[in-house]
């Protein structure tokens, strides 16, 4: 079975906002602190519907993408996050998972 961290990276690379949202629990939390260093505020998204809608818009308007993702371990990956062209080296961390492998909390922080 594919590790959750790999599924997360794959959904970002393929810009599949629906599959990304399905990785989370109904009330899952996605928190991205990297955007704080750009012209945007950090992102705090609660619930799979909010995650789906947010990334749908980000992908549609080419405002978010990733480059050079590398899995560090079963719960972390290093990547370059691009926020509307501004690039940040980042670490994505699966903070909390359910027993069936859904994400309760995921954070993305600058490296």
Model-predicted segments: where are they?
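A solvent-exposed, acidic/Ser-Thr-rich amphipathic alpha-helical stretch
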Residues: 25-72
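Short, aromatic-enriched amphipathic alpha-helices that serve as compact interaction elements
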Residues: 1-16
């Amino acid at each position: 079975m594919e590790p959750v961290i790999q599924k997360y990276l794959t959904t970002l690379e393929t810009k599949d906002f629906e599959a990304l949202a399905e990785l989370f629990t109904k009330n899952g939390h996605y928190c991205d602190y990297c955007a704080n260093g750009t012209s945007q505020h950090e992102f705090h998204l609660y619930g799979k519907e909010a995650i789906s809608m947010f990334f749908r818009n980000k992908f549609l308007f080419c405002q978010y993408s990733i480059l050079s993702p590398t899995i560090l371990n079963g719960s972390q990956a290093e990547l370059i996050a691009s926020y509307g062209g501004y690039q940040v080296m980042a670490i994505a961390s699966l903070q909390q998972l359910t027993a069936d492998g859904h994400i309760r909390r995921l954070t993305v922080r600058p490296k």
